[in-house]
Amino acid sequence: MDATEAARLEAERLHRANVAAGGDPTRPLVFALQEASNRGLDVYALREGDPQLKGGKATFDCQAGGILYEDRGSDFERAFLIAHELGHVVLEGGTLDVVTVDVEPDRSLEDAPVGVDRVLDYGARERREVKMGLFAREFLLPRPVLRELHVNEGLTSDAIAMRFGAPLAVVQQQLLDALLLPAAEEPNPVGAGAVAAPLTQIAASALLVN
């Protein structure tokens, strides 16, 4: 398992723990704020371009133990910024100041630094930010949850997007990841020695439009 997938699994674990503690993922901003509060972090919404954001969309101040984020966009977009900074705290220990200049909630995994060739094309900072973005998306919209809603409960991607207050493109990308990628750490889930295969791109795309 690579570091990116490990980060996503940790985000899913935190999502489930937050839900178990009473968090409501259909209210993404409140959900992200609750996780920050549970970690003793102060969170402040600032106007776009505020000097304290240091030219970014969100920052983490390790000395103050606080997250500052740009107060614009939907609740989901603001929650994503907070969750992105939480990724730095959870995965890196919160020992470094961070300025997040840009985020891509609907980033395709093909754009992430997976494999030697792609990693060589990325600098350390870019790889780090990709991982935090995927952490944030997994925290707000875990793949197993979306797969369950879509495949077993029959919800369309539009219905899931409405339930979580998330952009449709983000939900569809996360669903594609859930349907196309093999589940991590599931040895021999189908019979002795067998491994369940992920859906093909065509099959997954067909499911998304149903």
Language model feature labels by segment:
Residues M1-N210:
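Active-site hotspot residues in diverse enzymes, especially metal/ion-binding acidic/histidine motifs
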